[in-house]
Amino acid sequence: MTKTEEVAEVPGVLPETLTDFIGYLLRRVHAQFTASADGTDSDSREFLVLAALAGRDWESQLDLAERLGINRTIMVAVIDRLEARGEVQRTRNPDNRRQYVLSLTDRGRGALEARRGAVAERDDRLTGALTPEERTRLDALLARLLPESTQPLVRGTEYLVAQAHHRLRKHGDDKLAGTGLRVRHYGPLSALNTFTPCSQQRLAEFLAVTGPAVSQMVDELVKGGLVRRGRDPHDRRRYALEVTDLGREKLGVVARAVDSLAADVARMLGPGGEDELRSLLGKLLAETHSGPAPSDPADPVPSDAESDHSARVNSPVQ
């Protein structure tokens, strides 16, 4: 999640129609954790790499990147920084000169131990709403959402949430490959299909995202011919959004992918695991989300912000 993505989330409400989905709850918890971050994404990736190398040398930089869910280009930059600080050693693989063997140095072990304490303290703070037993259970359930080969490499609740969130998002989007759609399109399309016409501001409130974020989202749907943006006949200062016939057709495609993803998640978590994880994630969100979003986004509300569509800034929702 980038900085522009994280500011798309609005603490305070949760859309009831989306809270059944583990992937959605993970996204909100990940956004909540990211919003209170002390460091940067690069700090998180560096810790993951150091922790992975603590148990063994790694014979393929590319393989480690894939196991940790880190883009290969970003992985090169992470290793460059760690190597420059003397925390990681990168040497040619004698069995394959095209690959590098990654090793943790003594300095790297010291840096890892120092970070472990900080990570543990941060996890305690982020999961303060849970008992120690609940947090242990949360970590175990989150690990089930990761590939078996990755599970031993990712430690700490914050990192498990991030990895599970990214994996489910990719898994869902892979189901829509070739359609031009993303799992994130389900929320706005399903809301607009139910409540139409709908003002742009009301859609933002219903989805609990910022105005700039919903503008970017709607722009994307309008460009694809899935949503029509017109003026509200009752208030010319506002936009009235409607799903097109093509949008309804594509909503069916996205809905099937979302259902398939939910079934996959249920299988990964095992009997009772889905309800248990949903409850634990809900507890983490309870402190910052006071209640459900409005059930009808079509209710009229004043909106000065929508009167100047050209002033929007881009803030993608993932």
Whereabouts are the PLM-identified features?
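N-terminal leader segment of winged-helix/HTH proteins
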Residues: 1-40, 128, 132-179, 303-307, ...
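Alpha-helical structural segments
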Residues: 24, 28, 32, 54-55, ...
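N-terminal helix-turn-helix DNA-binding core of bacterial DNA-binding proteins
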Residues: 24-27, 31-74, 79, 85, ...
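Residues in the helix-turn-helix
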Residues: 74, 99, 213
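Charged, amphipathic alpha-helical coiled-coil/dimerization segments
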Residues: 81-136, 217-279
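Ser/Thr/Pro-rich low-complexity tandem-repeat tracts
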Residues: 290, 295-303, 310
